[in-house]
Amino acid sequence: IPQGAVVCDLGSGQGLTSMFLAKEYGFTVYAADLWSDPEENRKFFDEMGLSRTQIIPVKADAAALPFEKEFFDAVVSTDSYNYFGRDEKYLDEKLLPFVKSGGYIYIAIPGMKKDCHEHLPAELLLSWTPEQLDYMHDAAYWRDMVSRCRGAEVLSVSEMESNEEVWDDWLRQENEYAVGDRKAMEAGGGKYLNFIAIVLRKK
C-alpha cells in the first residue's frame, strides 16, 4: 500500500484497526461500520490523539457503500467480512468498484480448520447456534468463494500463523461476546477453529 494511501477499514467496529493503520502507517482511514456510532468513535479517536483528517468514521452498509468509485487504495476488513461477503457476487458488485486498479483487499476472519456444518461438534454448540456457525468456514470454502470474482486476482488464502494467539487475546476480553465464546473454547472447541487471511488485488 503506497505511503499516504486512502484506506477503508470495512466493518471497523470501534475502530481499533483503523487507529493502527493511521498511527503506524500514516494512512488516511475511513472507519466504515453499520452498527457502531460514528460520533462515539470520533470521541474515541479524539481521545487517542488522532485528527479528523487521519480517521473519518462513517456509518455504512457493506452492501451499499457511500463512497466515490475507485476512491480507495486498499480495503482492510478484520473479523467482519464473513458476515457480508458470503455471496459470490459481493466482491465484483459491492466492493471492488470502490477500489483503484491495482489496489489491495486484506481480509482476516475467524474460520474452521475444516468445514463441519453437517455434523457440528458438541463443543462448538456450547457457545454458538448452527446459524451463527454458518458464518464460519474453512480456507477451501473462502478460496472457492473469492476465486469466482472476475475483477480481482487472488494472491493468497491461508490459515493465520497467529491463530492461537488471536483466539487467546479475544477470549481475555470482558465483552459479552468474548465471555460467551469461552464455554466452547474451554471445552476444546479450539481444535476445530482458526483464523483465515485473504489477500486480493484488483485487476
Could you describe each region identified by the protein language model?
Residues I1-V6:
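Short helix-loop-beta connector
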Residues P110-Q132:
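Short, glycine-/aromatic-enriched active-site segment of Class I SAM-dependent methyltransferases
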Residues C8, Q14-A64:
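Class I SAM-dependent methyltransferase SAM/SAH-binding core
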Residues D134-R150:
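Short alpha-helix
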Residues K89-Y104:
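A short glycine-rich, Lys/Arg-flanked "PGG" loop and its adjoining helix->strand segment in the class I
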Residues A74-D87:
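A short SAM/SAH-binding and catalytic strip from SAM-dependent methyltransferases
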Residues A63-V75:
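A short acidic, Gly/Pro-enriched loop at the edge of an enzyme's catalytic core
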Residues S156-K203:
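Conserved Class I S-adenosyl-L-methionine
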